[in-house]
Structure formats: C-alpha cells, structure tokens
C-alpha cells in the first residue's frame, strides 16, 4: 500500500544520497582532478544538493505516474523512450547485468540531465518556440511533445552545482535507479517488485520529503 511504499522510500533515499555524494567526490578527484586536501568539499552543501537532487528524482517519478497532472507527456513515445524516468527504469532493468563498459559510461546521468533541463526550462525552450511546437504537434502526425517550464527550486541547476558539474557513472546511477524502482521484500517469502508511484498520494510525498529534510 501507499504507506508501505513511502516508508520503504525513506530508507532507499538515504542510501541514494550516500551513493550520489560519494560519486560526486569520486568524479572531483578523478575526472575533474581536484585536490580535495587543498580544496575540501563543503560536506553540508554537498549533502543538501544530494537531498535536492533525489527529491527532484522522486518528484519526476511521481508526476510521470500521474499523467493527469499535465506535466509529463507520457502519451508521447518519443518522450517515454528517449527521456522519461519510466523509460530509464526499463533500460536499467535490461542492462543491470551488462559489462564494465556499460557501468563506466554516463548514459543514465546524461539522460537525467536532459530530462531535468527540459522540466525546468520547458521544451521547446522559450514561449514563442513552445507555441510553435504546439501548432506543429496539432498539425503533424509525428510523435512530437511539449513541456511547460516547471520553475521550481528543486529543478533549478543553480541549486545543484556540484552535481551538475560532475559526470556520474552508470555503476552508481544504476544503484540509485534500482533503489528507487524495486521494492525490498519484508521477508524471505516475498519477491522484489517494481514500485508503483501512482499509489503515492500528496500526503505520502510530504512524509517522504520530511524524512529527507531530517536526514
């Protein structure tokens, strides 16, 4: 039920925050070549960014599961297969056991960056382009889609600069997608199942958010 899902998510999100923070630090030390002994990371700031990022992630899963809210264009296969978190969950299920090459790539991070960018700035960007796209969508038989800009702080890249500047490996992001996608069985007899975000209500989302703030 929804209460059980929200309780499970509270623990999953905490684990995700640790994985995400460690991956950002790994990228700083390796790819970015930052000497953290000379330029230490503000641990409190990084934790706050990870909190914002994970709530961003959770919120996208929520609005994709609720297409009636009108934010995520789930009727468009172009969006679902190319950009959506729902589609990314499917991809992760297929490649979970794949090679180290897949694990060391950045496909998941690149897809999420594009998705969050479109959500914050809208797609196409700019009001004029947006209006044109709506007309094209009406007149065309192609699987076009539009997204209105969702100018909420949790999607503002200025609030997650450390994460935005990092490149996050698939091996870390696969763990995060798994934790946010697959339920943990309460006992040995239960099977792991895919979490249904359509079962979550506003109250449960609020409870998860409060749990994040108390992290």
Label each PLM-derived region with a short phrase.
Residues 1-215:
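Preference for the N-terminal adenyl/adenosyl cofactor-binding alpha/beta module
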């Amino acid at each position: 039920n929804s209460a059980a899902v929200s309780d499970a998510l509270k623990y999953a999100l905490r684990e995700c925050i640790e994985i995400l923070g460690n991956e950002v630090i790994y990228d700083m030390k390796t790819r970015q070549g930052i000497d953290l002994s000379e330029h230490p990371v503000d641990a409190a700031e990084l934790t706050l960014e990870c909190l914002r990022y994970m709530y961003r992630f959770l919120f996208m899963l929520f609005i994709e599961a609720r297409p009636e809210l009108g934010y995520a264009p789930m009727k468009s296969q172009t969006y679902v297969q190319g950009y959506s978190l729902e589609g990314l969950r499917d991809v992760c299920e297929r490649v979970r056991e794949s090679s180290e090459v897949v694990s060391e790539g950045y496909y998941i991070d690149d897809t999420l960056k594009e998705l969050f960018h479109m959500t914050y700035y809208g797609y196409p960007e700019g009001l004029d382009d947006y209006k044109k796209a709506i007309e094209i969508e009406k007149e065309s038989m192609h699987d076009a889609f539009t997204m209105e800009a969702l100018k909420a702080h949790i999607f503002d890249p200025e609030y997650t600069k450390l994460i935005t500047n990092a490149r996050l490996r698939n091996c870390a992001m696969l763990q995060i997608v798994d934790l946010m996608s697959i339920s943990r069985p309460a006992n040995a007899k239960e099977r792991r199942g895919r979490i249904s975000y359509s079962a979550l209500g506003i109250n449960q989302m609020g409870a998860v958010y409060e749990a994040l703030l108390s992290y």
